[in-house]
Amino acid sequence: INAQYGFQPMAASLFDDSRFYFYLTLNDGQTLVQVPIPEALSAENFQRAIEEGLKRYASGLLKTVVLHAPAPVSPYLSQQGAPPSQQFTQLQGFLSDDFEVTIDQLENGQVPANADLVIVVDPDGLDERQVFALDQFLMRGGTVVVSSGAFAVQTSQSGINAVPRNSGLEPWLAHHGVSIESALVMDPQNAAFPVPVTRQAGGFSFQELVMLDYPYFIDVRAPGLHPELPITTGLSQITMSRASPLTVQPAENILITPILSSSLNSWRSSQTNVMPRIDEQGLSAFVPADDTARQTLGVALQGRFESYFANQASVLLNSPTTNKSDPQDGNANSSA
């Protein structure tokens, strides 16, 4: 059941060993839709839930989100020691509650024609065709959301390190006035990091988990969290893990709206060793820098953008799926 539908067994209570499955689905032979079980099990609530599920079978009633995320590493490569890719199945599940979600690597250089929004998470080494797909979607007036950073995190027996990465989007973002700086933001306003610590007592040693101050887990909240945007509605705070600061200098006709910022006491660090640090008393040993300031972590850009590929031959000219339209300016919204 878990492999085919992704459903987990349930229990009546934490202390009940009996397990059961209680899910409701709709299936037309091609598409399986999970219908949320309403909290109040009334006929009216069930009817409403089923009607919402049926909307997914009618074209035009739900907006379509194209999600570009790293392809999962094959089991064979994992056995050969290849590092696992980031998994965004939970994000896909949340989006699927309200949108029609399509997973697309954009390798053919085009965004699906029915897309209303493109979300790019954790991009790594995007090629020219993939960037072209995003660029042309933006030129058509589409909305592009990019979640990226200057570093990838590698965990090994020797520690936790931030490794520089190339998303493939750096020149395209810079063309639109957004640069992801090669640094990490550290903030005294942060979420804790659980670290096992060995203590000695009465001739015995025992290990316990200690929640350490960890400035790389930035706790973003007002006034650093914009309260009046649809994307932040209902959010009181958000934790950003090992984020890089943004420098934003778009064209004059572009409207800039800061979405996420660190606190006034945050600072930048070029250190790539991001292991938690503990002093002799078992406390966090991070020392704030002298130069502290609020750092921009997320922005929204809106206006008329110029194509990154303007006055260039289409990268799809040698492709059987050639897009014969020339890159043009367009009106669009974009977030990075």
Task: Label each residue range with its predicted role.
Residues 1-90:
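Hydrophobic targeting/anchoring helices
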Residues 59, 76-336:
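Acidic, S/T/G-rich, low-cysteine, solvent-exposed domains in lumenal/extracellular/periplasmic regions
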